[in-house]
């Protein structure tokens, strides 16, 4: 039997680091999914009719950014390996823009109406592109980190658990951050505009 399929290539620390990375991405995604529209409602800069349009703008932004998916895949394939692998650099490049756009989506910008809707669409599109830049190579890593099929299965299972936890994490992290922020809503109560921003900073970073 091929020794490559029996040898251990990953330490528990490496598996944990990879899993925590996926956890973080899912936490950011689900924070936006759960609180983005609610934030705009709390900010009070959009009419009811305009608020109804926001989910459709978010969907349109994600559709536009979906065009970016195969482009990222092609860039990964064409990138020469300079010792860091083909996938890791893309995740690193995406980190800062992803944090930036996550924060910008929860900034109470002093505009309203069509201008604010345009802002939401543009920043959500850029956020989705940054997320694609991070998520596509992150998902692909599980297939290339080890040629050992048993180890790969364990990696996928372990990281999958962290992904699932990350999806639920905002519902725990948000109240905790609100407890820390002076005058925050805490465990219960309505979040203020500034608390959405503090949570975006905390979860994004």
Residue ranges of model-derived segments:
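Membrane-embedded alpha-helical bundles of multi-pass transporters/translocases
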Residues: 2-205
């Amino acid at each position: 039997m091929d020794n490559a399929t029996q040898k251990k290539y990953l330490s528990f620390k490496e598996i944990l680091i990879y899993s925590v990375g996926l956890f973080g991405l899912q936490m950011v995604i689900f924070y936006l999914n759960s609180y983005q529209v609610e934030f705009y409602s709390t900010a009070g800069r959009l009419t009811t009719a305009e608020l109804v349009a926001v989910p459709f703008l978010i969907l349109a932004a994600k559709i536009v950014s979906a065009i970016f998916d195969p482009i990222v895949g092609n860039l990964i394939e064409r990138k020469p390996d300079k010792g860091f692998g083909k996938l890791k650099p893309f995740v690193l490049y995406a980190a800062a823009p992803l944090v930036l756009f996550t924060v910008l989506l929860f900034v109470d910008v002093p505009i309203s109406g069509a201008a604010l809707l345009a802002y939401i669409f543009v920043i959500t599109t850029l956020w989705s592109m940054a997320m694609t830049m991070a998520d596509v190579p992150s998902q692909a890593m599980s297939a290339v980190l080890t040629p050992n099929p048993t180890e790969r299965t364990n990696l996928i299972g372990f990281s999958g658990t962290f992904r699932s936890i990350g999806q639920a994490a905002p519902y725990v992290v948000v109240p905790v951050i609100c407890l820390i922020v002076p005058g925050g809503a805490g465990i219960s109560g309505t979040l203020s505009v500034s608390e959405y921003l503090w949570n975006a900073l905390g979860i994004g970073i």
